[in-house]
Each structure stands twice: as structure tokens, then as C-alpha cells.
């Protein structure tokens, strides 16, 4: 049985969308499958569009692998990049990320 992972997506206006999904999927997949507004995912998870940009809660950064060079280059395309910006298609959920909290940008690039 695959572990369930809970993720909170917080919209710019403060609305929170709690998603419970299986470990092993990407944050982007979890958002799309659960109807989270604000994750466009135009490229379908190929790290080629930056329309799945999220802000990871600073307390979670150490639990994530650092961005790849490709992800870092794509993040240069987002309008409001921050030190805790990530592309949700590049983060695979594990049981260690249960309770992960993310902020969604006001608009995707």
C-alpha cells in the first residue's frame, strides 16, 4: 500500500486547498488531479514552461533536493522569483513531505 501525503496549497488570497495524494507523484500532478487553481502545468511536467511555479514554505526547503540546472533556468522566467521558488513538476512527493505547505503566486508566467 502506498503512503498518503497531505499537501496544502495556499492561494495568494489566503484560500487553502488541502490535497491528499499518494507518494511518488509530483506536486504538479497532485495539484492538477485535485483541481488546484493556479497550477496551469502547460507543458505537462516536462520542466519547459514554469506555469507550475510555487513558493515552498522555508521550513521545508531542507527536505527537498536542490533544483536542477534546468529547473533553475526555467525559474529565471517567472515574474516573481523568490529564494524559495520551485517548479512543482520537479518535486516528487514522499512520506517525508507529509504536511508540506506551498504558496501559489498571484499569476503564473
Swiss-Prot record:
Cofactor mode of binding and number, as noted:
Binds 1 [2Fe-2S] cluster per subunit.
Transit peptide as a keyword?
Answer: no
> What does the record give under GO molecular function?
2 iron, 2 sulfur cluster binding; electron transfer activity; ferredoxin hydrogenase activity; metal ion binding
Provide a GO biological process annotation: P450-containing electron transport chain
- Give the family, as the similarity comment puts it: Belongs to the adrenodoxin/putidaredoxin family.
- The protein's organism comes out as Sphingomonas sp
Listed under subunit, the entry gives: Monomer. Carbazole 1,9a-dioxygenase complex consists of a terminal oxygenase component CarAa, a ferredoxin reductase component fdr and a ferredoxin component CarAc.
What does UniProt give as GO cellular component?
A: cytosol
Give the protein name, as stated in the record. Answer: Ferredoxin CarAc
Q: Which positions fall inside the 2Fe-2S ferredoxin-type domain? A: 3-108
Q: Which Pfam families match?
A: Fer2 (PF00111)
Q: List positions binding [2Fe-2S] cluster.
A: 43, 49, 52, 89
Any idea what job this protein has?
Part of the multicomponent carbazole 1,9a-dioxygenase (CARDO), that converts carbazole (CAR) into 2-aminobiphenyl-2,3-diol. Acts as a mediator in the electron transfer from fdr to CarAa.
Amino acid at each position: 500500500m502506498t503512503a498518503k501525503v497531505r499537501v496544502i496549497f495556499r492561494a495568494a488570497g489566503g484560500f487553502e486547498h488541502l490535497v491528499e495524494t499518494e507518494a511518488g507523484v509530483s506536486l504538479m500532478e497532485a495539484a492538477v488531479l485535485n483541481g488546484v487553481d493556479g497550477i496551469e502545468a502547460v507543458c505537462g511536467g516536462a520542466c519547459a514552461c514554469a506555469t507550475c511555479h510555487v513558493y515552498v514554505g522555508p521550513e521545508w526547503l531542507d527536505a527537498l533536493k536542490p533544483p536542477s540546472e534546468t529547473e533553475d533556468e526555467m525559474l529565471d522566467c517567472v515574474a516573481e522569483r523568490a529564494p524559495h521558488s520551485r517548479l512543482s513538476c520537479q518535486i516528487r512527493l514522499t512520506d517525508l513531505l507529509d504536511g508540506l505547505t506551498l504558496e501559489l503566486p498571484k499569476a503564473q508566467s
